[in-house]
Amino acid sequence: MRKIRTKICGITTPEDALYAAHAGADALGLVFYPQSPRAVDIIKAQKITAALPPFVSVVALFVNESAQNIRRILAEVPIHIIQFHGDEDDAFCRQFHRPYIKAIRVQTASDIRNAADRFPDAQALLFDAYHPSEYGGTGHRFDWTLLAEYSGKPWVLAGGLTPENVDEAIRITGAEAVDVSGGVEASKGKKDPAKVAAFIATANRLSR
């Protein structure tokens, strides 16, 4: 049986975290990127993680952050997986001795084809839409057909996903993990419970 896993990213409050967890999210993303409208600090992150039930993975998202700050956050917040969304290389990402996911901002098929060789130590790759000045959470999507024949390292689909299009996205790409942020929001940084539930329910329905 294939289980399509879901990550709800950009969680900013314990209430949103709890709702997503109870709706069946496999993972929740905390954004430690000050320029993001969904950014959290250590205090907020501690409150969110303290509210979570067992067996919900917490993912910390960083964008070109210093190693010193990353270590400080990892020491104070219970993080299971790190997601690097900037211009980090494999050597930088692996130094924290924590499973990591590397976001790949897709422009062409070669971005997908070369990703596994560039990040051999990544637990998984996350394919997201390219934007010249923003690192994720843009609401943009890329050409999903580029992933239709991909069979490399485990991967996650992101970029412009919503409750309305995640069905199509999974069918085209064969994704076994999907990541959403803006597509399930009432406003930037605030999740819409109905959208979160609908997104997860669709992914669960397509599991087999």
Curated annotation (Swiss-Prot):
Pfam family, one: PRAI
Protease recorded as keyword: no
Domain of life: Bacteria
GO molecular function, one term: phosphoribosylanthranilate isomerase activity
Keywords: Amino-acid biosynthesis, Aromatic amino acid biosynthesis, Isomerase, Tryptophan biosynthesis
Catalytic activity: N-(5-phospho-beta-D-ribosyl)anthranilate = 1-(2-carboxyphenylamino)-1-deoxy-D-ribulose 5-phosphate
Pathway: Amino-acid biosynthesis; L-tryptophan biosynthesis; L-tryptophan from chorismate: step 3/5
Main EC class the enzyme belongs to: isomerase
Any single biological process term in GO: L-tryptophan biosynthetic process
Entry EC no(s): 5.3.1.24
Family statement drawn from the similarity comment of this UniProt entry: Belongs to the TrpF family.
Name of the protein described by the UniProt record: N-(5'-phosphoribosyl)anthranilate isomerase
Provenance organism: Neisseria meningitidis serogroup A / serotype 4A (strain DSM 15465 / Z2491)
Record gene name: trpF
